[in-house]
Amino acid sequence: MPVNCQDAFYLTKYLRDTGSDIYCIDQFLSAYATPVLLDDCGFFVYFLNTVGENDTCIFLKDNRCSVQKAKATACKLYPFMVDPTEAGGFRFLYSREREHHFRGPLVETKNWMKKNFSQESRAFTQEEYAKAGSIGQYLRMIPENRKTEALMHFLRLRYSEYDLDFPFLEQFRRNQEKLLTILFRMAENETSSHKNEHF
């Protein structure tokens, strides 16, 4: 199950506030999630760890979610998925991967999303989608000998550098801008050095 930086923020906050030994997002990611490479440029995401032969979510205890109040966006929206559009809206997709899960009364997509896809989550998803292309582009321009440095900035500003006692979205926006500035400068320096080599 994917866990984005908004999910990591709220899951960490929930665990901290309910008596867990988890106090920061880095601890949460280390204990409960695994990074997965999304693109060869180095862009990675996190997925929640699983346990057992059936790859059960690490937070599922006795067939109940132990973090129900802070569960990941993908869990809240299931069996639907969200695909942001360039026009600023969303397409809602229906997962048919596990048909046996879908028994019971019919659900209207509009009502499901209104209940489970908050205004903050909508704003976050749109802004993350809008910036992801530029982040990937800059990462591709950065040479291998500086890629580790770039990815440390990526990890810090996408996932780690948050104060759990302040609103998430404002911090996310600030971190995104910082990350784009840093990666742009690293990519620009590489482009400039190549130009200088030709003179």
Residue ranges and their predicted role:
Residues M1-F199:
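Short loop/turn segments that flank or connect secondary-structure elements
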